Amino acid sequence: MTSRNSINRLPFKLTFLLQSLVLLFFASCSRIDHKQSALDPKGLVAQNQYDIFMLSVWITIFLFCAVGGCLLYVLWKYRAKSKDEAMEIPEQMHGSSKIETTLILASAVILVILAVPTLQGVVLMNRVPDPNDQATLEKLKLDKSQIEDAITVNVTGKRFFWVFEYPQYGIVTANELVFPASKAVRVNLRTEDVIHSFWLPKLAGKVDLIPGQENFLWFIADQNKIQQR
Protein backbone atom coordinates (compact mmCIF):
# COMPACT_ATOMS: atom_id res chain seq x y z
CA MET A 1 0.00 0.00 0.00
CA THR A 2 2.79 2.42 0.91
CA SER A 3 4.66 1.67 -2.30
CA ARG A 4 1.54 2.29 -4.41
CA ASN A 5 0.84 5.63 -2.66
CA SER A 6 4.43 6.71 -3.33
CA ILE A 7 4.03 5.87 -7.02
CA ASN A 8 0.76 7.84 -7.19
CA ARG A 9 2.41 10.89 -5.63
CA LEU A 10 5.35 10.81 -8.03
CA PRO A 11 3.57 12.51 -10.99
CA PHE A 12 2.39 15.34 -8.72
CA LYS A 13 5.91 15.96 -7.39
CA LEU A 14 7.34 15.83 -10.90
CA THR A 15 4.67 18.23 -12.20
CA PHE A 16 5.28 20.64 -9.33
CA LEU A 17 9.03 20.57 -9.98
CA LEU A 18 8.59 21.21 -13.71
CA GLN A 19 6.17 24.08 -13.05
CA SER A 20 8.64 25.66 -10.63
CA LEU A 21 11.47 25.39 -13.16
CA VAL A 22 9.32 26.95 -15.90
CA LEU A 23 8.34 29.79 -13.56
CA LEU A 24 11.97 30.47 -12.66
CA PHE A 25 12.94 30.40 -16.33
CA PHE A 26 10.39 33.03 -17.34
CA ALA A 27 11.25 35.15 -14.30
CA SER A 28 14.88 35.23 -15.44
CA CYS A 29 13.78 36.57 -18.83
CA SER A 30 12.68 39.90 -17.34
CA ARG A 31 14.80 43.03 -17.77
CA ILE A 32 14.71 45.80 -15.20
CA ASP A 33 16.69 48.14 -17.47
CA HIS A 34 14.13 48.04 -20.28
CA LYS A 35 13.54 51.42 -21.92
CA GLN A 36 9.92 51.58 -20.78
CA SER A 37 10.29 49.95 -17.38
CA ALA A 38 8.50 51.62 -14.48
CA LEU A 39 10.89 49.70 -12.21
CA ASP A 40 13.73 52.02 -13.20
CA PRO A 41 12.53 55.45 -11.98
CA LYS A 42 14.40 58.56 -13.11
CA GLY A 43 12.34 61.22 -11.37
CA LEU A 44 10.74 62.26 -8.09
CA VAL A 45 7.17 61.26 -8.95
CA ALA A 46 8.19 57.93 -10.50
CA GLN A 47 10.41 57.13 -7.51
CA ASN A 48 7.49 57.75 -5.16
CA GLN A 49 5.27 55.43 -7.20
CA TYR A 50 8.02 52.81 -7.28
CA ASP A 51 8.42 52.95 -3.49
CA ILE A 52 4.68 52.46 -2.98
CA PHE A 53 4.68 49.57 -5.45
CA MET A 54 7.59 47.83 -3.73
CA LEU A 55 5.95 48.32 -0.32
CA SER A 56 2.83 46.54 -1.57
CA VAL A 57 4.97 43.81 -3.16
CA TRP A 58 6.85 43.04 0.06
CA ILE A 59 3.63 43.05 2.09
CA THR A 60 2.04 40.71 -0.45
CA ILE A 61 5.04 38.36 -0.33
CA PHE A 62 4.91 38.29 3.47
CA LEU A 63 1.17 37.55 3.50
CA PHE A 64 1.55 34.89 0.81
CA CYS A 65 4.28 33.11 2.77
CA ALA A 66 2.40 33.43 6.07
CA VAL A 67 -0.94 32.18 4.74
CA GLY A 68 0.69 29.52 2.56
CA GLY A 69 2.82 28.33 5.48
CA CYS A 70 -0.22 28.06 7.75
CA LEU A 71 -2.14 26.20 5.06
CA LEU A 72 0.66 23.69 4.49
CA TYR A 73 1.06 23.18 8.23
CA VAL A 74 -2.66 22.49 8.72
CA LEU A 75 -2.75 20.11 5.73
CA TRP A 76 0.21 18.20 7.12
CA LYS A 77 -0.83 18.30 10.80
CA TYR A 78 -4.41 17.15 10.30
CA ARG A 79 -3.97 14.85 7.32
CA ALA A 80 -5.77 11.52 7.35
CA LYS A 81 -3.54 8.74 8.66
CA SER A 82 -5.63 5.92 7.22
CA LYS A 83 -8.52 5.24 4.86
CA ASP A 84 -10.95 4.75 7.74
CA GLU A 85 -9.91 8.05 9.29
CA ALA A 86 -10.38 9.79 5.97
CA MET A 87 -14.01 8.61 5.83
CA GLU A 88 -14.82 10.02 9.27
CA ILE A 89 -16.59 13.37 9.50
CA PRO A 90 -14.63 15.57 11.91
CA GLU A 91 -16.27 17.46 14.74
CA GLN A 92 -17.90 20.65 13.47
CA MET A 93 -17.19 23.75 15.53
CA HIS A 94 -17.00 27.53 15.29
CA GLY A 95 -13.60 29.16 14.87
CA SER A 96 -11.72 31.10 17.51
CA SER A 97 -13.08 34.60 18.16
CA LYS A 98 -9.62 35.74 19.28
CA ILE A 99 -8.03 34.60 16.03
CA GLU A 100 -10.77 36.22 13.94
CA THR A 101 -10.43 39.52 15.83
CA THR A 102 -6.64 39.44 15.47
CA LEU A 103 -6.87 38.82 11.73
CA ILE A 104 -9.36 41.66 11.27
CA LEU A 105 -7.15 44.09 13.22
CA ALA A 106 -4.06 42.94 11.32
CA SER A 107 -5.86 43.48 8.01
CA ALA A 108 -6.88 46.99 9.10
CA VAL A 109 -3.29 47.82 10.07
CA ILE A 110 -2.00 46.59 6.70
CA LEU A 111 -4.60 48.70 4.87
CA VAL A 112 -3.52 51.78 6.82
CA ILE A 113 0.14 51.07 6.05
CA LEU A 114 -0.71 50.95 2.34
CA ALA A 115 -3.27 53.77 2.36
CA VAL A 116 -1.12 56.49 3.95
CA PRO A 117 1.75 56.50 1.41
CA THR A 118 -0.72 55.90 -1.44
CA LEU A 119 -2.75 59.00 -0.55
CA GLN A 120 0.45 60.99 -0.14
CA GLY A 121 1.54 59.81 -3.59
CA VAL A 122 -1.79 60.83 -5.13
CA VAL A 123 -1.45 64.31 -3.63
CA LEU A 124 2.14 64.55 -4.88
CA MET A 125 1.17 63.52 -8.41
CA ASN A 126 -1.84 65.84 -8.65
CA ARG A 127 -0.24 69.05 -7.40
CA VAL A 128 2.99 70.81 -8.31
CA PRO A 129 4.67 71.85 -5.03
CA ASP A 130 4.43 75.51 -4.06
CA PRO A 131 7.89 77.11 -4.46
CA ASN A 132 7.20 79.19 -1.34
CA ASP A 133 6.34 76.14 0.80
CA GLN A 134 9.74 75.53 2.32
CA ALA A 135 8.59 72.64 4.50
CA THR A 136 7.28 70.68 1.50
CA LEU A 137 10.41 71.41 -0.54
CA GLU A 138 12.63 70.15 2.28
CA LYS A 139 10.52 67.02 2.64
CA LEU A 140 10.79 66.31 -1.09
CA LYS A 141 14.48 67.34 -1.15
CA LEU A 142 13.85 69.99 -3.80
CA ASP A 143 15.27 73.46 -4.34
CA LYS A 144 13.07 76.48 -4.92
CA SER A 145 14.78 77.05 -8.27
CA GLN A 146 13.58 73.64 -9.49
CA ILE A 147 9.92 74.55 -8.99
CA GLU A 148 9.91 78.23 -9.91
CA ASP A 149 9.06 79.00 -13.52
CA ALA A 150 8.10 75.40 -14.20
CA ILE A 151 8.09 74.47 -17.87
CA THR A 152 4.61 74.05 -19.32
CA VAL A 153 3.96 71.59 -22.14
CA ASN A 154 0.54 71.31 -23.78
CA VAL A 155 0.11 67.80 -25.12
CA THR A 156 -2.61 66.95 -27.62
CA GLY A 157 -3.34 63.35 -28.43
CA LYS A 158 -4.29 62.67 -32.03
CA ARG A 159 -4.82 59.47 -33.91
CA PHE A 160 -1.42 57.96 -34.63
CA PHE A 161 0.73 60.81 -33.21
CA TRP A 162 1.26 63.33 -30.41
CA VAL A 163 1.59 67.12 -30.55
CA PHE A 164 3.80 68.87 -27.95
CA GLU A 165 3.45 72.63 -27.61
CA TYR A 166 5.78 74.77 -25.50
CA PRO A 167 3.84 78.05 -25.00
CA GLN A 168 6.70 79.71 -23.10
CA TYR A 169 9.00 79.26 -26.09
CA GLY A 170 6.59 79.29 -29.02
CA ILE A 171 7.70 75.83 -30.15
CA VAL A 172 5.59 72.92 -31.40
CA THR A 173 6.95 69.40 -31.99
CA ALA A 174 5.47 66.02 -32.86
CA ASN A 175 6.07 62.71 -31.08
CA GLU A 176 9.10 63.97 -29.11
CA LEU A 177 8.99 65.54 -25.65
CA VAL A 178 12.11 67.55 -24.78
CA PHE A 179 12.83 69.08 -21.37
CA PRO A 180 15.81 69.87 -19.10
CA ALA A 181 16.76 67.77 -16.10
CA SER A 182 16.24 68.95 -12.51
CA LYS A 183 13.43 71.29 -13.58
CA ALA A 184 9.72 70.88 -12.90
CA VAL A 185 7.66 70.15 -16.00
CA ARG A 186 3.89 70.51 -16.03
CA VAL A 187 2.20 68.58 -18.83
CA ASN A 188 -1.35 69.59 -19.76
CA LEU A 189 -3.12 66.73 -21.52
CA ARG A 190 -6.04 66.83 -23.93
CA THR A 191 -7.33 64.87 -26.91
CA GLU A 192 -9.10 65.93 -30.08
CA ASP A 193 -10.58 62.57 -31.03
CA VAL A 194 -10.50 59.27 -29.13
CA ILE A 195 -9.24 58.22 -25.71
CA HIS A 196 -5.45 58.13 -25.44
CA SER A 197 -3.13 57.04 -22.63
CA PHE A 198 -0.09 59.18 -21.91
CA TRP A 199 2.62 57.41 -19.95
CA LEU A 200 6.23 58.21 -19.10
CA PRO A 201 7.18 55.02 -17.20
CA LYS A 202 10.47 56.34 -15.81
CA LEU A 203 9.13 59.78 -14.90
CA ALA A 204 5.45 59.70 -13.92
CA GLY A 205 2.29 57.64 -13.92
CA LYS A 206 -0.14 56.93 -16.72
CA VAL A 207 -2.93 59.43 -17.38
CA ASP A 208 -5.85 58.92 -19.75
CA LEU A 209 -6.83 61.66 -22.19
CA ILE A 210 -10.63 61.85 -22.35
CA PRO A 211 -12.46 63.85 -25.06
CA GLY A 212 -13.84 67.08 -23.58
CA GLN A 213 -11.67 66.81 -20.44
CA GLU A 214 -8.24 68.22 -19.67
CA ASN A 215 -5.87 66.35 -17.36
CA PHE A 216 -2.32 67.02 -16.31
CA LEU A 217 0.75 65.50 -14.71
CA TRP A 218 4.10 66.85 -13.62
CA PHE A 219 7.59 65.47 -13.03
CA ILE A 220 11.24 66.31 -12.47
CA ALA A 221 13.84 64.24 -14.30
CA ASP A 222 17.00 63.21 -12.46
CA GLN A 223 19.25 62.97 -15.50
CA ASN A 224 19.76 64.78 -18.77
CA LYS A 225 19.02 62.06 -21.32
CA ILE A 226 16.08 59.69 -21.09
CA GLN A 227 14.89 57.91 -24.21
CA GLN A 228 11.56 56.15 -24.55
CA ARG A 229 10.03 54.77 -27.69
Language model: regions and residue ranges:
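N-terminal secretory/membrane targeting signals
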Residues: M1-R31
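Non-transmembrane, membrane-proximal soluble domains of secreted or membrane proteins
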Residues: S30-F53, W76-R229
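Alpha-helical transmembrane segments
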Residues: S28, F53-K81
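Alpha-helical structural elements
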Residues: S20-L24, Y73, G157-R159
